[in-house]
Design a protein with these regions (language model features):
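An anion/pyrophosphate-binding glycine-rich loop and adjacent beta-alpha core
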Residues: 43-46, 51-52, 66-67, 201-204, ...
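Core beta-strand elements of the Rossmann-like FAD/NAD(P) dinucleotide-binding domain
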Residues: 10-12, 161-172, 269-272
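N-terminal Rossmann-like FAD-binding beta1-loop-alpha1 element of flavoenzymes
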Residues: 12-39, 445-450
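Short hydrophobic core segments
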Residues: 15-17, 155, 167-181, 195-196, ...
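Glycine-rich loop(s) and the adjacent beta-strand/alpha-helix scaffold that form part
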Residues: 172-218
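Glycine-rich FAD pyrophosphate-binding loop
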Residues: 31-55
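Conserved beta-strand-loop-beta-strand element in the redox core of flavoprotein oxidoreductases
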Residues: 146-167, 173
Length: 451
């Protein structure tokens, strides 16, 4: 075993594990405050996940006000107030501008580099690190964080399995290893094992912002590639057959209505865009609802109902259909559907309603019209599972926030250990929130190390 210990250097030595968004900012800020900083990245390149974020455009942050911003993290959002107080959106944008990155605001408040190129952001952070003389070591895997008497002493690392282990002395370690998604970028969940080995509790990991697999794979395949805009996705804690139609109450009042079952619990309901894939459903609104659906699956069956005409209530849709049938009575059922649905959904709808495709509109009975309306308001799928964690955009779960001081990002168990980014139990919707959390917690961890 070889040692790497600074000789004649009175500065505090900080080892940052992980060269992603939070790790780079943490390393640069700690060095800026006077520490000797060694940044360890197990892949051959810094910022690999940053380079693919936002479809390689890098959705840096969001323009929403602080209160709305915090709400995007759910019940754990309050944990971030301290980090955002030290380093928030304007601070991030000012830092990037200092290194030549201009930004722009797009729909939903999403902020991107003006160049639409994540490489410009990664290059800016690399210049930030170089300016403050951060020692960067790529292709180095940390195998253990060393502790004595509940205090950090350093880390063990090695280049590969055949190389000798190297002990790096450290006064402090910032764990910035990210989550367990996008493993090709180096995010393979190593940090969870390191933290657990030191006694930290790991909140169970689940995929978040992830497409969902349905049981009705043949139906999904028949609609594969269909993109749906301005639809409402409703998720229920029940099998699809147990969802009442649109005429049922929208929520269970505890009383129900005569002749009908109370509507099952609604897990979540969102309006937006989604798509049908060969295995199930994806797209923005699906991703945003996925974590609640994943968590609900642990408690029993989950189904979804797609409202393809959310702007119309049940009676309005019935009237719309009747008007179409009256005005175009000689048109076939297939041609009527062509005015209501994307092309690839027409044949599945014909099969599901059981109405002959060539039946003239004026011959469609009231019961058949109700069947059509029912499908338009509630196209149902049973959810089998999410895609694997490796296919998710972010990881839900991680190091328990109860064991981290939100004022400093310091471990409450081990002196000299700090956390930042996705390794902690923090996750949010898409829109730049997860990157901002990584940047802000990385900055606060570095500030705290300096203190």
């Amino acid at each position: 075993m070889t040692h790497s210990i600074p000789a004649g250097d009175e500065r505090k030595t900080v080892v940052v594990i992980g060269g992603g968004a939070g790790g780079m900012l943490a390393a640069g800020r700690a060095a800026q405050r006077g520490a000797r900083v060694i940044l360890l990245e197990k892949t051959g390149q810094l910022g690999q996940k940053l380079l693919v974020s936002g479809k390689t455009r890098c959705n840096l942050t969001n323009s929403k006000p602080l209160k709305e911003f915090i709400a995007m993290y759910g019940s754990n959002g309050r944990f971030l107030y301290g980090a955002f107080d030290h380093f928030f959106r304007d601070d991030l944008l000012a830092l990037l501008e200092r290194y030549g990155v201009q930004t722009k605001v797009e729909r939903g408040g999403r902020i991107f580099p003006a160049s639409d190129d994540a490489r410009d952001v990664a290059a800016a952070f690399r210049r930030y690190l170089d300016d403050h003389r951060v020692e960067i070591r790529t292709g180095v895997r940390v195998t253990e964080i060393m502790v004595q008497d509940a205090r950090i002493t350093g880390v063990m690392s090695r280049k590969d399995r055949n190389s000798d282990p190297v002990f790096l002395f450290a006064d402090a370690v910032i764990l910035a290893t990210g989550g367990a998604t996008w493993p090709g970028t180096g995010s393979t969940g190593d940090g969870y094992d390191m933290a657990a080995a030191l006694g930290h509790t790991i909140v169970p990991l689940r995929p978040a912002l992830v497409p969902l697999i349905v049981e009705e794979t043949a139906l999904a395949k028949s609609m594969q590639g269909v993109s749906l805009r301005n639809v409402r996705l409703n998720a229920f804690q029940c099998r699809a057959d147990d969802i009442d139609d649109e005429k049922a109450p929208t929520r269970d009042t505890g009383r129900g209505i005569p002749g009908k079952r109370p509507r099952p619990p609604v897990i979540e309901s969102r309006l937006g865009e989604m798509m049908v894939t060969h295995f199930g459903i994806g797209g923005p609104v699906t991703l945003l609802m996925s974590l609640k659906i994943v968590d609900a699956l642990a408690g029993g069956p989950v189904s979804v109902a797609i409202d393809l005409k959310p702007a119309l209530d049940w009676s309005q849709l019935q009237n719309r259909l009747q008007r179409d049938f009256d005005q175009h009575g000689k048109r076939s059922y297939r041609r009527i559907l062509a005015g209501l649905l994307p092309l690839k959904m027409i044949e599945p709808f014909i099969q599901m309603t059981g109405i002959p495709a060539d039946k003239p509109a004026h011959q469609i009975a009231a019961t058949e019209r109700e069947r059509i309306a029912g499908l338009l308001k509630s196209l149902r799928f049973n959810i089998r599972a999410p895609l694997p964690l490796s296919s998710a955009i972010i990881t839900a779960g991680g190091v328990s926030l109860k064991e981290i001081d939100s004022r400093t990002m310091a471990s409450r168990l081990i002196r000299g250990l700090y956390f930042c980014g996705e390794v902690m139990d923090i996750d949010a919707d898409t829109g730049g929130y997860n990157l901002q959390a990584a940047f802000s917690t990385g900055f606060l961890a570095a500030e705290s190390v300096g203190n």
